[in-house]
Amino acid sequence: MITGIQITKAANADLLNSFWLLDSEKGEARCIVAKAGYAEDEVVAVSKLGDIEYREVPVEVKPEVRVEGGQHLNVNVLRRETLEDAVKHPEKYPQLTIRVSGYAVRFNSLTPEQQRDVIARTFTESL
């Protein structure tokens, strides 16, 4: 169990009025803030704190969502035939806008190679 404390009495003056998180299961203390001698987030054995007195302080734990890497999806809702026709007849599709790597671009502003690449990557037979 994690308990938040403020040290009110200690032989080591650096500990006085410092805040810690005590992990009773591991026998460890994590420094939240101290005047000197201890770094923020430094973890020490509770026994290293020596003979101390403290008062408990409320600890609020907020769930943290960690995203590493992530996913990215571009959705273009149209038919393959529309893009192929836009390659052949760009004048018919001056406003045709698609998503490429998160950006909206006019299909006609892409090079022919980029247009072919978009068509090849956008339409697949199966996943």
Curated annotation (Swiss-Prot):
- Which residues carry the post-translational modification N6-acetyllysine, per the record? K48, K88, K92
Can the keyword Acetylation be found in this entry's annotation?
yes
Keyword rRNA processing tagged: no
> What Pfam families does the entry give?
Gly_radical
Membrane spanning segments where? Answer: none
- Chain positions with Glycine radical modification: G102
Enumerate the GO terms in the molecular function aspect: formate C-acetyltransferase activity
Q: Which keywords does this Swiss-Prot/TrEMBL entry list?
A: Acetylation, Organic radical
* Record's GO cellular component terms: cytosol
Glycine radical domain boundaries? 5-127
Describe its function.
Acts as a radical domain for damaged PFL and possibly other radical proteins.
NCBIfam families reported for this sequence: spare_glycyl (TIGR04365)
Task: State the PANTHER family in the record.
Answer: FORMATE ACETYLTRANSFERASE, FORMATE ACETYLTRANSFERASE 1
Matches recorded under HAMAP family: GrcA
Q: What is this protein called?
A: Autonomous glycyl radical cofactor
* Gene that encodes it: grcA
